[in-house]
Amino acid sequence: MSVFSNILDENSRNLRNEIPCDDGIASPINDDDEEFLTKSNRVLLVGADSNSSLKNLMTQYSYQVTKYESGEEAMAFLMKNKHEIDLVIWDFHMPDINGLDALNIIGKQMDLPVVIMSHEYKKETVMESIKYGACDFLVKPVSKEVIAVLWRHVYRKRMSKSGLDKPGESGTVESDPDEYDDLEQDNLYESNEEGSKNTCDHKEEKSPTKKPRMQWTPELHHKFEVAVEKMGSLEKAFPKTILKYMQEELNVQGLTRNNVASHLQKYRQSSKKTCTPQEPQEDFVWGNAGPDVTLAASKTLLSSHATPSYLINNQAAPRGSYFMNNIPYPSTSCLPVNNNNCFMTNPSTYIDQFQHQLQQQQQHQQYQSTLNSISAMLTKQESRHVPSSAMENSEPLMIYNSNLPFGIDECFPPAGFNIFDQIGHN
């Protein structure tokens, strides 16, 4: 069982689920690759276990295995025949030379990929092995599926020596930002897999050149959109077909399938966001509210056409200025209190009561004026026929004029009634 192998298998499954797979896509195979496919890989197996089951299993998968149960003997053999070994598998718990010591020696003096194996899978053990340059970590018992693909470390080592970071990518092509980050991860992983450099060696032997980032110019993006439209729809567009159309029909050079795949994924996400309809906001917003019916009615009541000017609130009007018609009043329904800080009021009820009381006051004054004039006239006319003694002892004469705009019951207010006291209370 291999920790790295499980991670690689899981990542492969995730990629197959997320990215549409194009049939017929394969890495280019050159003559060197064909030679590697037919060639057997030479493996040095170092372990204290005398059981040869692992060796027999590796032999079934066409590995040429040389096995040692002593670390010192294995290291001596490796010093003399380092050019005849393609892969080293070393037990982490060897008594004389453990796995970390072997990684240190091989990393300084040789250029071989080293795989560490152990019966335990503690994180500390795995992390230490990786830090010292192990390209893989196997947990005993090792399955046949893991053994079957151990040759990938030898193949990756050959690619790193020939300067091929990834098949199918040109050194002059700019990489996407996401691809650039992935490339850094791959380079770090490959340097660990080489098993030939420790931590200090990695810092000293960094590659002086890095691939520049991919720049999708507006013109290049327009050609990309033309290619997508040519496919019929965004769902039918695949990186391989888009790249082929851009290279053959639009004469675009320097692009790779990974560049197009990354840009296509971002383009799909952007299209989904653009096509998603905006849901109406259900939350109440004051800006969307309709007109305030109460406030509109209050403004109507307080307008100069419907209400006398002395009934409109003034910020600095004294108590006695209610009857002053020449003072300009603001057309608002706010009362001034506490240093002219206004608050809203509902003046409808107050104005109705106040107008009714003023009407009563005017009617009473009109009645008093009419009554006084009539009484004066009767007194002058009837004083000639009525003796003075009779007038002194008789009750006051009450005369009602039917032409007045009020009834006889409304002539006199109740005893003790004062219109100005009523206005002050209200």
From Swiss-Prot:
SUPFAM superfamilies, per the entry: CheY-like, Homeodomain-like
GO CC aspect terms: nucleus
Stretches assigned to the Response regulatory domain: 40-155
InterPro entries: ARR-like, CheY-like_superfamily, Homeodomain-like_sf, Myb_dom, Myb_dom_plants, Response_reg_B-typ_pln, SANT/Myb, Sig_transdc_resp-reg_receiver
Keywords of this entry: Activator, Cytokinin signaling pathway, DNA-binding, Nucleus, Phosphoprotein, Transcription, Transcription regulation, Two-component regulatory system
Post-translational modification: Two-component system major event consists of a His-to-Asp phosphorelay between a sensor histidine kinase (HK) and a response regulator (RR). In plants, the His-to-Asp phosphorelay involves an additional intermediate named Histidine-containing phosphotransfer protein (HPt). This multistep phosphorelay consists of a His-Asp-His-Asp sequential transfer of a phosphate group between first a His and an Asp of the HK protein, followed by the transfer to a conserved His of the HPt protein and finally the transfer to an Asp in the receiver domain of the RR protein.
Expression across tissues: Predominantly expressed in mature pistil tip. Also detected in the shoot apical meristem as well as vascular tissue and hydathodes of the leaves.
Short sequence motif named Nuclear localization signal, residue ranges: 210-213
Biased composition (Acidic residues): 175-193
Residue(s) carrying 4-aspartylphosphate: 91
One annotated GO biological process: regulation of DNA-templated transcription
Cellular location(s): Nucleus
DNA-binding residue intervals: 213-268
Region entry Disordered, spans: 161-216
Biased segments, Basic and acidic residues type: 194-208
GO molecular function, one term: phosphorelay response regulator activity
Family, per entry: Belongs to the ARR family. Type-B subfamily.
Function noted in UniProt: Putative transcriptional activator that binds specifically to the DNA sequence 5'-[AG]GATT-3'. Functions as a response regulator involved in His-to-Asp phosphorelay signal transduction system. Phosphorylation of the Asp residue in the receiver domain activates the ability of the protein to promote the transcription of target genes. Could directly activate some type-A response regulators in response to cytokinins.
Subunit structure: Binds the target DNA as a monomer.
Protein name: Putative two-component response regulator ARR20
Organism listed in the record: Arabidopsis thaliana (Mouse-ear cress)
Upper taxonomic lineage: Eukaryota, Viridiplantae, Streptophyta, Embryophyta, Tracheophyta
Gene: ARR20
